[in-house]
């Protein structure tokens, strides 16, 4: 490989830091998020000088981690840089969320020099006990691979960590001491090696035989989820759905994984909280294929799914099962391809999916009618266009949108497993940086936005023009629905949302406050026309109203 060293860097020597950057560039990373600190400053010089990687500074480390997560979901790899101790601990929540939700993020920590560590002195940003691996040990719980780089083995260790991150689709951790970052080394001699295929021909053959026997002449029904996307098996899943008439649904975690405008798309399955048509089709399917499905509490109606294992083919990351038979090692893509081959080879066509009963279109609300949850999400969904990237924060925004069918080509991002409120605002920065040609739409509650709102200014600095809908329902409405309807701990300070962008350095924006349907309609109409500006719309909703789906989930919730 040709080294990517730039003359813009004052150091003409090719270094370990350059090696790391070139490997990240090879994996598709063209922006790195983070916050400077004295232990990483010289490494940041190399980022700035790199010919294909750009530095994107964040307002704080937590936001940088969230931004890297949003970027990684769309690009398939991302990186965040922090300083030792104080910086890396600040980003820990974001990294844990990336681990839970299978997002490949490389966390690079600038550390003290090896000589300074060797003295075991009480250096700043440490715990003062001379042990400089406390935080490395913490990282082992929330990353799939870790390395404390040493000069002699740095290249090999970088390759190991990056390979694991690429393979497992989870974060990795690299402790890069400032002197190691400057240490001379050779550039990569070959592309980062890929793991050999993880499918046993015998396992695949036995799986195929068992699947043929179970499927017979039945119509397949498919329930798919997030891991299909993370494991880059979407094309194989789409080929399976095209092999016959295959009714299919997703969980909320995998929303937008499949084309929701397809006549064969049933909707969102959420256990007992599902629409009855969806629940009956999934739970009553003669043969159900579950692809990349993880039944978490918040997407399964608190584990109310009723799936018969005897009629289920379950496709996982490294193994699959047919009824009670398990086959491994068997990669997801290979198992999906085998099922598609079975359907195309059996020479029969399944009947078309019966469409739901036609319903009269809802009456258009009066322009002076106060906003409701249903009005807001209906109108937001009608404003979406192919290519939009929609991020819905964990709350009324996420569950309000989950029930709505999205146009083809819209990507939906939420965080229903980790559920860290405020995540989506910085993640929207990362998503917009990853694909600036696709307009980002952020849907977030007032309480969640107060946690991470500093990143509004980053949108402006980076020349991004998202549409941001802030749901002002005067506090933590989801928590009020669960417990403490009038409790003071669910109250928040009221902010002037329409003035906030200017205070945070946004220079090219429009801001609206909508209390009625007409005001919301006007604001979103302007937002659609002004793609050159950030448009913030504050929508004022009753403090106790929640979307239908969220109400059903809360009603079935038991103390966990």
UniProtKB/Swiss-Prot annotation:
It holds the Pfam family TPP_enzyme_M. GO terms for biological process: aromatic amino acid family catabolic process to alcohol via Ehrlich pathway. GO terms for cellular component: cytosol; plasma membrane. It comes from the Bacteria. It is an enzyme of class 4 (lyase). Disulfide bonds: none annotated. Residues 396-478 are annotated as: Thiamine pyrophosphate binding. Belongs to the TPP enzyme family. This is Alpha-keto-acid decarboxylase.
